[in-house]
Regions:
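Acidic-basic catalytic patches of nuclease active cores, encompassing PD-(D/E)XK
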Residues: 1-42, 53, 146, 150-154
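Active-site-adjacent loop/helix micro-motif of nuclease/hydrolase catalytic cores
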Residues: 39, 66-77
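Short connector loops at helix/strand junctions that flank enzyme active sites
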Residues: 41-43, 55-59, 75, 86-88
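Conserved catalytic cores of phosphodiester-cleaving nucleases, focusing on short active-site segments
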Residues: 44-50, 54-66
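Long, compositionally biased, intrinsically disordered segments
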Residues: 48, 52, 77, 95-96
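Nucleic-acid nuclease catalytic cores
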Residues: 84-110
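Helix-rich interaction surfaces within compact, conserved domain-sized segments
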Residues: 110-156
Length: 157
């Protein structure tokens, strides 16, 4: 990919950054493992720092709804909670469904309880609305029209 192409492809049509995972590779993961047991790290599913105007508002680990259960006492999640608590930021593990889009929240620290209930399941619209509230912003009518407002069948039974 040329430098010029990268510059023109940094943002999608709606102004959000494009996915950049093509810049990463498996070799660094393998190399880091070679550094030994006393140098632990974890490759997370999709760790996001939700932010507004350059200031973080939440630390969220997104996981597909069929991913393995998360143990918040595991060193990985204790480290993430400590990181979030130091700011302090809400820390959440959020499972997602894709058809329709929906989200189930697992609370990772006390700060998250201000925004969500543990185990709360939300439609895409309700979840995104909450993310906007964290930023003290409002969902636009245009975005509102695009978001799923129902839950998948397996969540409504």
């Amino acid at each position: 990919m040329t430098h010029k192409h990268r510059l023109t492809q940094q943002f999608s049509h709606n102004g959000t950054r494009l996915e950049r995972t093509a810049w990463r590779d498996e070799q660094i993961s393998a190399r880091h493992r070679a550094w030994g047991f006393d140098c632990p790290a974890v490759d997370l599913d999709f760790l996001a720092v939700e932010y507004n105007v350059g200031k973080p508002v939440a630390l969220i680990e997104y996981k597909y709804h069929k991913a393995a259960k998360v143990d918040l006492q595991h060193a990985t999640y204790r480290a993430l909670a400590d990181l979030a608590n130091a700011y302090p930021l809400p820390f959440l593990i959020v499972r997602y469904w894709r058809e329709p889009w929906a989200f189930r929240v697992q609370i990772g620290n006390e700060a998250a309880l201000h925004w969500f209930n543990d185990g709360e399941t939300l439609s895409e619209f309700n979840y995104v609305k909450r993310l906007y509230l964290m930023r003290r912003a409002k969902v636009t009518a245009e975005l509102h029209a695009k978001l799923d407002k129902t839950l998948p069948e397996d969540l409504t039974k």
